Amino acid sequence: HRELHSFPTRRSSDLRFRGTREDILRCVRGARERGLTLRTSIIVGFPGETEDQFRELLDFVEETEFDRLGAFTYSPEEGTPAAKMPDQVPEKVKEDRFSRLMLLQQKICLRRNKARIGSVEQVLVTATEGDGFCLGRSSREAPETDGEIYIHCGKTTPEPGLFIPIRISEAGPYDLKGEML
């Protein structure tokens, strides 16, 4: 998990960020080659963030295709260096940028989840829903922050805490549906 904010290709000394866009993309490529799930958090509206920098961030998010992305708008904390920085971004601009980022990420999540349709995955059963359904999570979904997998179990509903194989059958931007094998 890596927290980001909009950044040009130079290093950002404002947040003591160690790395450039190219450094992050190299890490992303390595993680993808190993089949890892990529997640990050993004601060929108950090002081001094320009529209051009924000568009560069959107391009970066589109190129990177994080599996999971959380975002929040910057809010000044008393006593921090950023709270005293010039060029504070207006709330309305921060909210607009946040909405644009989340809309983009929703499309990315849907695209990445659709790519999982037909795959067989091991999931941890987290709850039973009755009528032959249960909820679960694979190694790609973090508890309390990511979507869930709704599983049709048939006549045998496994108990929470068991790992079961499923085939992903449907995908939404955040949640998946599957069939127990």
Where are these regions (language model features)?
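Short, small-residue-biased leader/transition segments that mark boundaries at the very start
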Residues: H1, H5-S12
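Short, flexible, glycine/charge-rich loop motifs used to bind or transfer phosphoryl groups or to couple energy/partner
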Residues: H1-R2, D59, R112-K114
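Conserved non-cysteine loop/helix-boundary elements of the Radical SAM core domain that shape
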Residues: R10-D67, P76-V93
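Terminal RNA-binding accessory module
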Residues: T73, K84-L181
